[in-house]
């Protein structure tokens, strides 16, 4: 597959950087790490080497959503087949001096807006440990870190990670949450539709209709 094929396939739905972020994460969520290096190569040819850290960070950020094993396999596939154009540095090193718990809480509240407390109470009623891990780790240390991938790009990445898993309750919140982080309705629906098509290509069977705006 060439970058022209990818761009023709999803012609005009998203700008190239966002398209490639959504694509690698959707394939990773579908457990198709074999697709990752080809897309990363296309992205570097079309956008330039600067997209490589974004693709790597998008996959890192997807880890609490799709699971560490799939993320590890996808990143290994990418880095093994495409030598990183820049040294791999610990991007979150500066977080040692930041209250990531507070940062995660702010990010969580911006994502869910007026339904923040309802979402939090729902998680807490299921498991206090789960709620704290979600806020402190997933949101605090991972999703709210914006030095490489922006909040808007993170929101599109989350949609791409959730669609293949057929988890409408979570997808519903993040479709709306993406709007709160600056995405347009068209961008949100494009990320959803691209991830949905990739899921079908990978043989994912859905129980019913996938959530929409």
Curated annotation (Swiss-Prot):
The cross-references to Pfam families, in alphabetical order and at most eight, read: CMD (PF02627)
Molecular function (GO) terms for this protein are: peroxiredoxin activity
- Which Cys pairs does UniProt list as disulfide-bonded? none
Q: Among its keywords, does the record have Phosphoprotein?
A: no
Placement of sequence motif Peroxisomal target signal 1 (PTS1): 211-213
Please indicate if the UniProt record lists Cytoplasm as a keyword: yes
Q: Which GO cellular component terms, listed alphabetically, does the Swiss-Prot or TrEMBL entry include?
A: cytosol; mitochondrion; nucleus; peroxisomal matrix
What the entry lists under SUPFAM superfamilies is as follows: AhpD-like
GO biological process: one example: cellular oxidant detoxification
- Lineage, top-rank taxon, reads Eukaryota
Subcellular location(s) per record: Peroxisome matrix; Cytoplasm, Cytosol; Nucleus
Keyword vocabulary terms for this entry: Cytoplasm, Nucleus, Peroxisome
As for what it does, the entry says: Probably involved in peroxisome formation or maintenance as well as in amino acid metabolism.
The UniProt comment on domains reads: Peroxisomal targeting signal 1 (PTS1) is a tripeptide located at the C-terminus of more than 95% of all peroxisomal matrix proteins. The prototypical PTS1 is the terminal tripeptide SKL (serine-lysine-leucine) but the consensus of PTS1 is defined as [S/A/H/C/E/P/Q/V] [K/R/H/Q] [L/F]. However, this description of the PTS1 consensus must probably be expanded beyond the terminal tripeptide.
Family assignment from sequence similarity: Belongs to the PXP2 family.
Record's protein name: Peroxisomal protein 2
Q: Which organism is it from?
A: Schizosaccharomyces pombe (strain 972 / ATCC 24843) (Fission yeast)
